């Protein structure tokens, strides 16, 4: 509830077109890599290879829990992930995208852990 209120209040300051839930990536995306056709790997951001992960920017992603928006922003299809949007940051332990069976298992573990600690 507090997150919804925070987003709603941010939207109503008049400064923002959207407010929505986000969380940070567990690991730095700047140290990420992909498998290449030859079977090896290649960094997406090789310029950060020698940087410590704690020295890299914190990257956020959409938590998909709620979206507030001004009517004109929705009607004009204004892009959401831009400077005119307010991020309501939610801790990672409250966010789980479910696309795979692995994701579902992780969501169940998070839920069980939360129930045990409450």
Name what the model sees in each region:
Residues 1-84:
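Conserved core of the sugar-phosphate nucleotidyltransferase
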Residues 58-118:
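Conserved alpha/beta core of the MobA/IspD/sugar-nucleotide pyrophosphorylase nucleotidyltransferase superfamily
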């Amino acid at each position: 509830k507090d997150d919804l209120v925070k987003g709603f209040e941010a939207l109503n300051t008049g400064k923002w077109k959207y407010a929505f839930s986000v969380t940070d990536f567990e690991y730095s995306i700047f140290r990420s890599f992909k498998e290449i056709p030859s079977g090896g790997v290649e960094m997406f951001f090789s310029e950060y290879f020698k940087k410590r992960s704690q020295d890299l920017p914190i990257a956020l992603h959409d938590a998909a829990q709620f979206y507030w928006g001004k009517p004109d922003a929705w009607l004009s299809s204004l892009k959401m992930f831009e400077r005119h949007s307010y991020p309501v940051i939610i801790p990672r332990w409250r966010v789980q995208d479910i696309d795979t069976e692995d994701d579902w298992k992780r969501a169940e573990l998070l839920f069980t852990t939360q129930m045990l600690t409450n």
